[in-house]
Amino acid sequence: MDSWFTVEQIDCNTFAISEYKHWEETHSYLLCGEKMAVLIDTGLGISNIRKIVDTLTQLPIMVITTHIHWDHIGGHKYFKFIAVHEAEREWLSAKFPIPLQVVKHSLMCKPCNFPLDFNIDQYQIFQGVPQMLLHDGDSIDLGKRKLIVIHTPGHSPGHCCFYEADRKYLY
């Protein structure tokens, strides 16, 4: 398994996938239902999070995004189905608000043991068209597992939390 990521099992079908080796210490969450799995955020994009996800589930994956900041969308490039809040569609598809050089500086500002295949000169901020737009109150059904979208703007215009009432989990 890729040593860049740390996987912690929260319950039988919920996993935290973390990047503890970087100062940002980003966390993504994999929730497996009966029909599909949801990956909440994809981290920094320093290493391929898809390889880790594929060791945990064979279900189809929908990526849902808490917000469009570089440390939450870096691994979006490894997935086909991405959902974001409607207020951040343009940030994802065309107008990311932070220049690439600022992001690269933030990525490298503190020393860490990057994977050998990571090259900062090739690092890009993910840009793409989301396959689904999220709205406050939307329900995402994974098959015997359901998330409710809660729009929580402030950190960014389209910031969202995701609530799973049956387990009382808030992501």
Describe these PLM feature segments.
Residues 9-15, 118-122, 143-145:
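Short Pro/Gly-enriched beta-strand edge/turn motifs at strand-loop
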Residues 1-2, 23-25, 126-128, 134, ...:
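Residues that act as N-cap/strand-start positions at coil-to-secondary-structure junctions
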Residues 44-139:
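Active-site HxH/HxHxD metal-binding segment of metal-dependent hydrolases
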Residues 3-55, 161-171:
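Conserved beta-strand hairpin/beta-sheet module of binuclear metal-dependent hydrolase folds
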Residues 9, 16, 65, 83-84, ...:
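Structural signal for conserved beta-strand scaffold positions within catalytic alpha/beta enzyme cores
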Residues 36-39, 44-46, 125, 131-132, ...:
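Metallo-beta-lactamase
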